[in-house]
Amino acid sequence: MVGMAVTMEHAGMTHLLADGIARLAGPAFPLAAPFIGALGAFMTGSNTNSNVIFGDLQQSVAALVGVSPLIILAGQTAGGAIGSAFAPAKIIVGCSTVEAEEGPALRAVMRYGLAMLAVLALTTGAAIYLFGR
């Protein structure tokens, strides 16, 4: 993961993606930051890997949009923690331990995870607009 993230940064891919996200999301970007963190953790099964892959991206978008990178990166990390909880790798391990089916377990956990992400997105947005310009 680190190799991929470093390659993306050195090749300019991270900045290109950040520019596109900043143009697309604009001032609403803080609401999306936790979802990006959750996506990274969902894909990799790890909050740390999510931060490695998307940390530079989030920081670049924050700079382009003109908001506090500290709050955005806090949203990234908190979103990654939530996303890690319903990562398929973790669901498979848990279900194999208790001999349950993965599909129903993933659907049940996703409902709660998406609700928590929505609250986190609103919290991140509020923190930016109240404290973090």
Regions found by a protein language model. Give the residues of each.
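Transmembrane helix-loop junctions in multi-pass membrane proteins
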Residues: 5-18, 43-46, 124-133
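Alpha-helix capping and helix-loop boundary segments enriched in small/acidic/polar residues
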Residues: 8, 45-53, 69, 73, ...
